[in-house]
Amino acid sequence: MDGASFEERGEGWGEGRVLAMKPLALFGGTFDPIHIGHLTVAWEAAELLDAEVRLMPANVPPHRSPPLATPAERVAMLRAALAGQSRLVLDARELERDGPSYTIDTLRELRAEQGERPLVLLLGADAFAGLPGWNRWRELFDFAHVGVLSRPGVDALPPAELAEEAAARRVDDVAALRAEPCGKLIELAVTPLEVSATRIRELLAAGRDPRYLLPAGLFDDAALLQPYRR
């Protein structure tokens, strides 16, 4: 990183005490680049939970190759993508850390900041099925609820140890997430779009224009997508 401060932390959302216990949902990823598939499921989760959703770009993801775009470039794309609305918010704290981005560290930090406010970690069905491979995965439930973004009619089969853990924590009513700060699991039926960031990068590298796979704001400044054209 170039030493610039990534100031977006999302503090101050919702003035007054009335909104204090609304859930805060967290949606992580490399966002390399941010595309309409990310935004669609994040927006629907925000509606289903009646929550703010923070998009949290990872610095060095432990389970995949490093992003092609730099942290500053990904932040610029996210800012452009999220302009004009207030329900989806950028939180770039993980980019300020050195080394791998471990979710447990982020949740610990957010819990210290948010007190008893319910936190909801949003995971795609495939990511959830791979949860036992995450660093200290069982401890995640000590700091947040987990919301699994599921495709209607499609069930991802988790391994036995995760299925057992999930069965004891599963709830069907979003209201149950507001009653406690952490520890529950809920499935959220969203409309996933089969959009591939890898394919988008390939198209851009070939000089193509994947206009309707990316948020419109990314085309307002040609420099935003330059990381994938060089």
Describe the residue ranges of each PLM region:
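Nucleotidyltransferase catalytic core that binds NTPs
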Residues: 16-230
